[in-house]
Design a protein with these regions (language model features):
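Acidic/histidine-rich alpha-helical segments that form the ligand environment
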Residues: 82-119, 130-135
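Short, contiguous alpha-helical
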Residues: 3-20, 24-27, 32-80, 120-157
């Protein structure tokens, strides 16, 4: 049995199951005209959040599996320069990249050869378990912001 149950729980958490809305539902049906709006009181648009999530998730994934990875400069390297996507193609490209990286993190977690508890050799004490939880937590936080913005803009259920 080992850590099979823990891996299943992590995969569910990364997938947004349970108490969370999954990322696909969070980003589905957002008209292009709303993607770059910063509602009153919100510091970011949906596009900025999507890109921030993509960039941060990629950084965490690459840190987890690549000793030569260099993280972006904090904080500016983790946020897009534009408030809105330049076009629909870039929006779709960002979502596709987000999905691929999330899938790669899930694959890393699901692989029984991945030691979830071992310290990442090039880190400062981090483990794959910690990095997977960080991805899930970070995504859940910002997906909540996306849904809040969608509510304010009248674009949520």
């Amino acid at each position: 049995m080992g850590d099979k149950i823990l891996r299943e729980h992590l995969l569910n958490l990364l997938s947004g199951r349970g108490a969370h809305v999954d990322w696909k539902d969070s980003f589905s049906g957002i008209p292009a005209k709303l993607r770059g709006i910063r509602p009153n009181g919100f510091p970011h648009s949906i596009w900025e959040l999507v890109e921030h999530m993509r960039i941060a998730q990629r950084d965490i994934l690459e840190f987890s599996r690549n000793a030569k990875h260099v993280s972006p400069e904090w904080p500016e390297g983790y946020w897009p320069s534009a408030q809105a996507p330049p076009n629909a193609k870039e929006w779709e490209k960002s979502l596709k990249s987000f999905a691929q990286d999330l899938g790669a993190m899930k694959k890393l977690v699901a692989n029984s050869k991945t030691n979830l508890y071992a310290k990442i050799p090039h880190g400062t004490g981090q483990t794959i378990l910690r990095e997977a939880l960080l991805v899930a937590d970070h995504n859940a936080y910002h997906l909540g912001q996306v849904i809040a913005i969608r509510h304010i803009l009248g674009n949520w259920r």
